């Protein structure tokens, strides 16, 4: 990950941003990234540039070979990959071609190296060549065995050898103690190499003898501690833990041929400076302890610190009098803090701290495994490395002097392709062969999948004054110019400006935008090309700012509208250049607005007053329309041109308010811009322009002139766009939480008037072919009242389209849309649609009915959904006493009777009938409702007469009701008293109990009915007649197919019922009696039955008696067929026998 943080240090004081200056770097200057040439620029800003200086793979080497070790020599510009897995090493120079790749396989030394060495990575180093040779030599050292291989030239590594040595190749085995191993191999070329051992010994390796010939000579520079061999293993483990954190050897300036300064750190803080010669000689120049001076420097800023660690130090090859130390200490939260300490030496070589740079961008709970510091050029830049995090300190010049800016770079180590294998440093002064070159100080990274990456410090920041504007501009330019390789290798942190206030960040970006779109016209570029170029640059900087900066919603909108203004100017200028008729009108207006008739200056200097332009255009059209009222062709041409300008201006404003800004923030949470203030007067101008356009379009849309019709069609499209812009812009302004225009009285009054205008506009759009667009626009601005009206205009042949849109809005807007659509259906008496089409929105419908006291619709809705109890409570809400239980039951039965009756009309559900019948059927329902209400209201006065109440219930004959509670309540003492009444009631009681006997599959219901009849004060003939009727109806209702199957299956659920019926002796006797009379269809039987019926039902007319007689006769015929088909006379004795045995 690559993170950039911004830090300013100047005597530990806060940095105050300066004014705006300097131009933004061109984001297109890195187009060479697409080429195959190296180096490739990955990203850049004012402080540094990041480049890829070698190919990601060389020759046949690929990332799949899993290198685990890397080495880079930034002086000789060579690098090395080592893979233990395949026991190979790949060597290449920065600019090497694939054919020059050197691949070395160390398995050829299996006779020399033991198995442990073959399976472990070697230490390596490049050797500085002779002045006459550009090709370096190479060292490989196996730490455990001490075997050292030296090739005078890297090209010799491909030579197959059979002998231990051959010309140009040397093998030497360093004498190691038991349990001793090699730890670090440090290049001090041209003065040889330094080798640190796990025992603490420091060796100097010289690769030439006194005559200049190749020879390996080893001298002990520091004997280390005298540790017995028995304790050396324990010491090795301790040293291994610390050696990765403290590198004790650093090589400094090259003094001459074969001479170099070397710095070593002993005992944690004792610095020794050596003069080393290629002949193997050495001389100690100075030695001193730097602990106290560093502690004093830390305590100036952090007084609580009393101890610290020196993790690493670095010296520059160009300046022997300056070194940098990376130190660490714990704070009160037990976190490790880090700082870069710059130490300088005076002419007497006495050290003092010249700069303290606290690393504010990195804290850690534990010390990282890799801690490095690099000082490539004193007084310009310092690099610090913490595992995968790099902290860079750049020295810059501000108004109050020089100070350091800290930036934080983090390597993206999520993939193996981005892993960093080694670090190198490139000094400002670079010696190559016999030449001394001046180079840019840089940090070099050897990556696993992207080759060599160079972080190059820039010197430009020391030439000009550095400020917050400069810094922000360079960062935004850097982000905009990132290459794909940079994004893969690094990640960027957006929070690099967290120590600046929001207003400072926004003001700086706003100033950058001003600089961008007021840049002067370049040579050979037209005004229009300049405007489009400025628009692109402005868009780029705003998009990058939105991505990486923390800006408030209002600041985001202000930046967007700055782009909108620039975009509108570009579009207006294009209209001015490309449309001759438009040009005449627009030029005339623009010349009035320009003091020196220089129209281009209005656009280039961004001083065109949009509000004034709209007023002038409105006045121009009014004047022309008044002068040539009868000239329809001229009026329509002028209004089309004026509409083009209105559409360009308001369209750009709206586009950046509504569309593009929605990607970054909620438009309802932003406020308007002060760039060009949208006042009520200007909205009113737009409204007047729309009304004038609609009025003119009405006059000319039926014209027979072909040209006028063509322009009229264009005007129709313009009306659509202008209405859309006006509606959406006002909707956006209305939702601005902090917008002063919304809070003004004028805007509120305007919005009320606009609501009526909007309805008329949308309906006009629907009438001229834009019905669907008008519906969508009404939905966008949440004008649901107009929307439901427009939905009714959809194709009536396919009502599903309208219903789908209505349901989609109900799902999206819930109650907000439900109240509008339901009220509309009620007002237009679309009851069938209201009660049938929206059944899945039951909760919304019920809430709507209840809230608006629409009980006449609510009880029907509940009833058709089967909620009879709830529906009855609603239907009789006004006439039901709370404590009257009888009236409650009556109301339930009455509702059931009513609902059953309405469903039997011609087999249709009255509530679901088509629209032509709904009014008539609704009146019928209300009539029945009034009748039952009158009946129940009369019962209120006689609630103490329980008999009359029960009689009313039974008279209602609600045989379709099956509640157990109602049935049990009917079989009560009240029902017994009912038996004393007319015979008509008794027949209805038989019907009632027969229906329940079927549902309950129980003969108890029949038995109960017969018991009540027997207790009644009726003649014996009447009793036997009714008993015969009860038995026969029961047998007709029993599912005999189930009973026939059950007589052999004793576990069947029907068997208890069969047993119960068969054990009834009266039933068997009656069945045998019926066997003799079942086929009696003679006129004598009919005549006797008729006489009997006339005696029982004396109140019936003769025709009514005959009808009832024929109904009973058909019932007997059905019973006869049933007995024959099912062989009941054979089956019943069998069942009786089975039941008796059981």
UniProtKB/Swiss-Prot annotation:
It comes from the Eukaryota. It comes from Schizosaccharomyces pombe (strain 972 / ATCC 24843) (Fission yeast). The gene is nup131. PANTHER family: NUCLEAR PORE COMPLEX PROTEIN NUP133 (PTHR13405:SF11). One of its GO terms (biological process) is protein import into nucleus. Belongs to the nucleoporin Nup133 family. The keyword Protease does not apply. Functions as a component of the nuclear pore complex (NPC). NPC components, collectively referred to as nucleoporins (NUPs), can play the role of both NPC structural components and of docking or interaction partners for transiently associated nuclear transport factors. Active directional transport is assured by both, a Phe-Gly (FG) repeat affinity gradient for these transport factors across the NPC and a transport cofactor concentration gradient across the nuclear envelope. This is Nucleoporin nup131. Keywords: Nucleus, Transport.
């Amino acid at each position: 990950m690559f993170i950039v943080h911004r830090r300013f240090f100047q005597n530990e004081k806060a940095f105050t941003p300066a004014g705006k200056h300097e131009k933004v770097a061109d984001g297109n200057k890195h187009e060479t990234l697409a080429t195959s040439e190296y180096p490739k620029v990955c990203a850049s800003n004012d402080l540094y540039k990041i480049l890829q200086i070698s190919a990601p793979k060389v020759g046949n080497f690929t990332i799949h070979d899993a290198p685990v070790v890397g080495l880079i020599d930034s002086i000789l510009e060579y690098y090395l990959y080592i893979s233990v897995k395949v026991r190979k090493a790949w060597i290449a120079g920065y600019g090497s071609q694939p054919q020059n790749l050197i691949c070395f396989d160390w398995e050829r030394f299996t006779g020399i190296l033991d198995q442990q060495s073959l399976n472990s990575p070697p230490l390596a180093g490049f050797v500085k060549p002779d002045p006459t040779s550009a090709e370096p030599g190479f060292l490989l050292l196996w730490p455990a065995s001490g075997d050292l291989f030296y090739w005078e030239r890297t090209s010799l590594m491909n030579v197959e050898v059979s002998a231990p040595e051959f010309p140009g190749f040397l093998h030497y085995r360093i004498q190691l103690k038991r349990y001793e191993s090699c730890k670090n191999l440090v290049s001090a070329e041209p003065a040889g190499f330094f080798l640190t051992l796990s025992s603490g010994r420091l060796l100097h390796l010289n690769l030439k003898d006194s005559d200049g010939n190749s020879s390996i000579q080893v001298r002990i520079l520091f004997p280390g501690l005298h540790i017995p061999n028995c304790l050396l293993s324990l010491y090795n483990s301790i040293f291994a833990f610390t050696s990765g954190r403290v590198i004790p050897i650093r090589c400094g300036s090259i003094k001459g041929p074969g001479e170099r300064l070397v710095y070593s750190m002993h005992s944690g803080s004792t610095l020794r400076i050596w003069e080393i010669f290629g002949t193997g000689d050495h001389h100690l120049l100075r030695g001193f302890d730097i602990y106290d001076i560093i502690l004093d420097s830390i305590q100036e800023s952090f007084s609580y610190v009393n101890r610290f660690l020196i993790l690493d130090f670095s010296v520059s090859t160009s300046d022997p009098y300056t070194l940098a130390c990376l130190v660490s200490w714990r704070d009160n939260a037990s976190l490790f803090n880090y700082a870069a300490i710059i130490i300088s030496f005076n002419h007497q070589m006495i050290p003092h701290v010249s700069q303290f740079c606290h690393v504010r961008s990195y804290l850690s709970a534990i010390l990282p495994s890799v801690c490095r510091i690099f000082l490539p050029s004193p007084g310009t830049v310092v690099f610090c490395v913490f595992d995968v995090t790099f902290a860079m300190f750049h020295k810059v010049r501000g108004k109050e002097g020089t100070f350091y800016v800290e930036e934080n770079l983090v390597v993206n180590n999520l993939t193996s392709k981005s892993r960093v294998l080694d670090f190198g440093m490139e000094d400002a002064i670079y010696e190559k062969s016999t030449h001394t070159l001046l180079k840019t100080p840089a940090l070099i990274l050897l990556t696993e999948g992207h080759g060599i990456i160079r972080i190059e410090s820039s010197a430009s920041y020391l030439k000009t004054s550095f400020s917050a504007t400069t810094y922000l501009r360079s960062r935004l330019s850097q982000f905009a110019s990132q290459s794909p390789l940079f994004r893969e290798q690094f990640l960027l942190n957006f929070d690099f400006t967290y120590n600046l206030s929001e207003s400072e960040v926004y003001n700086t970006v706003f100033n950058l935008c001003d600089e961008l779109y007021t840049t002067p016209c370049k040579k050979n570029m037209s005004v229009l090309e300049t405007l489009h170029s400025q628009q692109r640059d402005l868009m780029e900087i705003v998009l990058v700012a939105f991505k990486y900066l923390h800006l408030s919603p209002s600041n985001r909108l202000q930046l967007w509208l700055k782009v909108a203004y620039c975009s509108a100017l570009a579009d207006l200028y294009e209209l001015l250049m490309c449309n001759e008729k438009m040009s005449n009108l627009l030029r005339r207006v623009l010349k009035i607005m320009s003091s020196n008739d220089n129209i281009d200056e209005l656009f280039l200097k961004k001083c065109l007053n949009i509000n004034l332009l709209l007023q002038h255009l409105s006045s121009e059209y009014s004047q022309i329309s008044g002068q040539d009222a009868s000239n329809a062709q001229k009026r329509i041409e002028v209004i089309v041109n004026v509409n083009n300008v209105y559409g360009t201006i308001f369209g750009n404003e709206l586009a950046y308010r509504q569309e593009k800004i929605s990607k970054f923030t909620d438009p309802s949470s932003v406020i308007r811009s002060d760039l060009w203030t949208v006042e009520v007067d200007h909205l009113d101008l737009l409204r007047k322009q729309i009304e004038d356009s609609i009025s003119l379009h009405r006059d000319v849309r039926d014209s027979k002139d072909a040209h006028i019709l063509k322009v009229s069609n264009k005007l129709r499209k313009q009306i659509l766009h202008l209405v859309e812009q006006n509606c959406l812009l006002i909707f956006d302004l209305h939702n601005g939480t902090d917008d002063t225009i919304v809070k003004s009285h004028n805007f509120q009054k305007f919005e009320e008037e606009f609501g009526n205008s909007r309805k008329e506009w949308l309906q006009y759009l629907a009438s001229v072919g834009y019905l669907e667009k008008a519906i969508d626009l009404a939905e966008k601005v949440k004008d649901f009242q107009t929307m439901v009206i427009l939905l009714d205009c959809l194709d009536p042949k396919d009502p599903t389209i309208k219903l789908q849109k209505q349901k989609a809005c109900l799902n999206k807007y819930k109650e907000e849309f439900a109240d509008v659509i339901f009220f509309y259906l009620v007002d237009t008496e679309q009851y069938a649609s209201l009660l049938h089409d929206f059944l899945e929105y039951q909760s919304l419908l019920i809430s709507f009915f209840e809230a608006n006291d629409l009980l006449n619709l609510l009880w029907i809705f509940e009833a058709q959904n089967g909620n009879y109890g709830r529906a009855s409570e609603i239907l009789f809400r006004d006439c039901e006493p709370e404590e009257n239980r009888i009236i409650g039951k009556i109301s339930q039965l009455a509702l059931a009777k009513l609902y059953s009756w309405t469903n039997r009309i011609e087999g249709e559900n009255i509530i679901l009938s088509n629209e032509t019948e709904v009014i008539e059927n609704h009146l019928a329902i209300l009539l029945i409702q009034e009748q039952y209400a009158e009946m129940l209201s009369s019962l209120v006065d006689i609630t103490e007469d329980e008999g009359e109440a029960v009689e009313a219930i039974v008279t209602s004959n609600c045989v379709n009701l099956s509640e157990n509670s109602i049935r049990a309540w009917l079989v009560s003492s009240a029902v017994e008293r009912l038996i004393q009444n007319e015979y008509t009631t008794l027949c209805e009681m038989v019907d009632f109990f027969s229906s329940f006997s079927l549902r309950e599959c129980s003969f108890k219901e029949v038995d109960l009915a017969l018991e009540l009849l027997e207790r009644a004060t009726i003649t014996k003939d009447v009793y036997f007649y009714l008993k015969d009727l009860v038995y026969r109806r029961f047998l007709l209702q029993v599912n005999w197919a189930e009973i026939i199957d059950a007589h052999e299956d004793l576990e069947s659920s029907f068997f208890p019922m069969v047993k119960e019926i068969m054990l009834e002796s009266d039933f068997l006797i009656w069945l045998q009696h019926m066997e003799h009379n079942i086929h009696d269809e003679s006129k004598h039987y009919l005549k006797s039955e008729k006489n009997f019926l006339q005696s029982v039902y004396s109140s019936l007319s003769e025709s009514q008696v005959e009808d009832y007689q024929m109904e009973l006769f058909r019932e007997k015929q059905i019973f006869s067929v049933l007995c024959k088909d099912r062989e009941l006379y054979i089956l019943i004795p069998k069942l009786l026998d089975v039941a008796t045995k059981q």
